[in-house]
Amino acid sequence: MKPDITFYRRFQADILAGRKTITIRDDSESHFQPGQRLMVGQYEDGRPFCEIEVIGVTPVMLAQLNAQHAAQENMTLDALRSVIGEIYPQIERLYVISFSLVRALAG
């Protein structure tokens, strides 16, 4: 089964434990809707590992990222800004996708 959204493998444990409850994406992934259930896979190999439900999608400027966003990503604000800069260089307008874990998949 092809995932609807992917995350780097390093984030899998935090998602499954409920420590990571948002993801910050660019315009290409801003189309998700509240209530939508997504199959989640690892970015590296596409292997599905859970299902999440989208709670909301909110636009945010890179400069507006704050400590609350960092806590929801389970990292420091400096680490969050660094990761976002690596993944989305030169992009200022982003989208916060908040989600909850529906179920983990047997692996």
Swiss-Prot record:
InterPro entries: AC4CH, ASCH_domain, PUA-like_sf. The keyword Hydrolase applies. It comes from the Bacteria. Keywords: Hydrolase. GO terms for molecular function: hydrolase activity, acting on carbon-nitrogen (but not peptide) bonds, in linear amidines; N4-acetylcytidine amidohydrolase activity. Disulfide bonds: none annotated. Its EC number is 3.5.1.135. This is N(4)-acetylcytidine amidohydrolase. Gene3D superfamilies: Hypothetical protein. Pfam families: ASCH. NCBIfam families: PRK04980.1. SMART domains: ASCH. Catalyzes the hydrolysis of N(4)-acetylcytidine (ac4C). Belongs to the N(4)-acetylcytidine amidohydrolase family. GO terms for cellular component: cytosol. It catalyses: N(4)-acetylcytidine + H2O = cytidine + acetate + H(+); N(4)-acetyl-2'-deoxycytidine + H2O = 2'-deoxycytidine + acetate + H(+); N(4)-acetylcytosine + H2O = cytosine + acetate + H(+). Residues 6-102 form the ASCH domain.
